[in-house]
Regions:
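Mature catalytic core of soluble alpha/beta enzymes
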Residues: 2-226
Length: 226
């Protein structure tokens, strides 16, 4: 809970500091926030805010969470992980597409991005209440369970199979981006032309600011203190 409170404060700070100039046009923006995908998800609409647009966008984010969250026992990704080394699991078009894209990025990056780092994420307790540093021996063992080339996709059957028992798919590094893309698409379909989708710091803008100018998005310097 402490981590979520810190995330909430950070998101609020980002929204106030980066986007306060958007209200200068005289249009009153509306925002809604929910805890989804393990973080604070906030949508701000500047031109045509409507309850229907907010509802549809957050429902789409929730749908993606229910498919891809590693923290939900009955999510598709959790079922894929439980079936590692045993059998292929049929999944939705959303999940198949995101895993397919994750593997493509893994290949292009030479493994710098790897969606099968789940065992290491779990061992380090990243995102949890009690993070720790595993021993070198534990890390060496868990690395044997990491390898994007051992994820087998069947496009015809739309299934995912992890070849070795103990492998864990973790889409945390890509699912929020996909959810932001989908939320923006839904907002556009509802006639929204100016909005910000902020999923725990994964920021996506829709259209231009209401005064026609470009958005300015601040990026934290990784070498400086926050």
């Amino acid at each position: 809970m402490k981590q979520l409170r810190r995330i909430g404060l950070l998101v609020a700070f980002i929204v106030v500091v980066l986007f306060s100039s958007c209200t200068k046009s005289g249009v009153e923006p509306r925002s809604q926030s929910f805890l989804m995908l393990g973080t604070v998800c906030r949508i701000t609409i500047y031109d045509k805010p409507s309850d229907a647009a907010f509802k549809a966008a957050f429902e789409r984010i929730k749908e993606i969470e229910e498919h891809m969250s590693i923290h939900m026992d009955e999510s598709e990704i959790s079922r894929v992980n439980r079936s590692a080394g045993k059998e292929a699991v049929p999944v939705s078009e959303d999940t198949f597409l995101v895993v397919q894209k994750a593997l493509e990025i893994a290949r292009l990056s030479g493994g710098a991005f790897d969606p099968t780092v789940g065992p290491l994420v779990e061992a380090w307790g990243i995102g949890g209440e009690s993070p720790r540093r595993p021993s070198d021996e534990e890390i060496a063992h868990l690395l044997t369970l990491v390898g994007y080339d051992r994820v087998i996709l069947d496009e015809e059957e739309q299934t995912i199979f992890l070849s070795d028992t103990g492998m864990v798919l973790d889409l945390g590094a890509i699912a929020k981006g996909y959810a932001a893309d989908e939320a923006a698409r839904v907002l556009t379909e509802h006639g929204v032309g100016s909005a910000i989708v902020n999923l725990g710091g994964n920021v996506l803008t829709v259209g231009l600011k209401v005064d026609g100018s470009l958005w300015r998005i601040g990026i934290q310097d990784p070498e400086q203190e926050r």
